[in-house]
Amino acid sequence: MTEEVILKVGLTPKHQCSYLGHEQEQLLVLMDHNLLNASGYERLLTAGFRRSGNDIYRPHCPACSACQSLRIHSERFVPSRSQKRIRQLNQDLELVLSYDDKPEYYQLYERYIRERHHDGSMYPPSRTQYKGFLHCDWMPPLYLEMRKDNRLIGVATTDLLPHSLSAMYTFFDPAHADRSLGTFAILSQLDLAKRTGRTWLYLGYLVEACRKMNYKRQYLPHERLIQGEWKNIDTKPE
């Protein structure tokens, strides 16, 4: 039986979509602070919500439904040949978990944004932007460090929830782009979910028509929230 919950939400003004420039975007923003905890947020994830900083939101666009929440079952996931190669390529890295936001994280983030996303909405990077996006007062994120010979070359931020993980953002040293650390970060979070008995890894929103957002469809099988129901997807798009 599905439990119905009445939520108090606000609606942002319309503005240009950052994924599909020809569309107008509006967001539902949670106003009910009773759900600002790990278990409450996990329930909201199943309904298509997402965290950014302290805020929880969900797309509520007037003429578009391109954003689809996507999640991967940690036990059912089957890596592709290329994903297996990426995992093998990065076996020389040390993975370290931390709840402390270390100064070297921002230094790496700043370099990543300047060199990889200088044409995007996150440029120029700033400490205020970094904290406002990743930090959360009611649930500190977990940082998954990727180190080579003790040198930090990548960080994946994720929310560790009772029965799932929710991937937030990954940034890395552009000098190591050939390692495909973004893919490796997702594979590592799936490994962490499986190792700790957590069922799902949430990857946020898939937008098929946006190159920066459609990479998520390569992790199979996965589920997408379509018209209020989670649908299993087990084949690659044509």
From Swiss-Prot:
Its EC number is 2.3.2.29. It is found in: Cytoplasm. Transmembrane segments: none annotated. Keywords: Acyltransferase, Cytoplasm, Transferase. Pfam families: ATE_C, ATE_N. The keyword Cytoplasm applies. HAMAP family: Bpt (MF_00689). This is Aspartate/glutamate leucyltransferase.
